[in-house]
């Protein structure tokens, strides 16, 4: 009998990615007034011997020699960004996780000619992108695969992606084991007072003409600290991640401000959350060397304070010398960030329990369709147990030192 043929792009839909060793899948979405809309899912390319037929894990298995920990990670980028952080994939796979990254509609791999880069008028629009990705990963709403029901889903978002995933998690808590936020844009740079002053004018502009461009405030300093073409160490596509960022439009900023207002009211997330932030911000109109070792996009003190409104069990890790995207920081800060994530995963994301043998005393004690992995019940129990401790931590977070406030 002939050997089964290895899967190809024609048989699976997956095609070679722009990143060596990775592959991508285009996810068709509902069209909008600019035409065709897609998202793009990215994962490590598997070797030819890993046939798609009988693939119980829906692709993207951990590396050979690494024990499968039973968790799957979906990463979502921030504003004017796309997935290129291969070291992040390396890290999660070394933890025994399957790793996937999503380029949202009108970003990176998903940007089509004639589209307004990054433009939406509601962050809930991304629900369709996220659901399409989760369906491919085996975590869709209608997933009936018992193998996948016992795997935990960890979401990781950077900046605006962190805000988007926080809002999505609050609406879909029964499907999530944990949430990792890399410098999430939970609050406006001028904090809540500035946001509330600005919001009415932005909302009016969004109603009148959501695509009118707003003044450019990105001076390119963050790109200078990150890109190898300048003072940074990373190679990426400057067309997909421009030096001064995409043009900001009123409709998009209005969507962000609405999302931040929702966080301020409290999202009530009951699953464990990890927030990674630099210890300092440098928000200045001129370049300084400190921008190589601090967040030049967000006010980290305001974000740290707002993170207490995410839910009941929030761990805040402040990383000395970290950039806005902490995994693009210099090696010492990057290593510290990864160690914080690894520690959090070990402590807060339980591994699946071994399935009971048929006929054993334990068999039949789990409700049909629930599986032996119960992240939400565990998280809610843990959250209740530490609620008083979290209140104390929140008070300490509001007095966190070591952050540089923006100078006039």
Annotate each predicted stretch with a short phrase.
Residues 141-159:
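Alpha/beta-hydrolase fold nucleophile elbow
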Residues 215-314, 318:
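Serine-hydrolase catalytic core
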Residues 45-104, 111-113, 290:
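Short, surface-exposed "cap/lid" segments of acyl-processing enzymes
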Residues 313-408:
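Catalytic active-site module of serine/aspartate enzymes centered on a nucleophile-bearing elbow/loop
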Residues 160, 164-248:
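Alpha/beta-hydrolase-fold enzymes
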Residues 79, 103-108, 185, 320-323:
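Short beta-to-alpha linker loops that shape the active-site pocket of alpha/beta-hydrolase fold enzymes
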Residues 1-66:
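N-terminal cap/lid segment of alpha/beta-hydrolase-fold proteins
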Residues 119-141:
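Alpha/beta-hydrolase active-site loop
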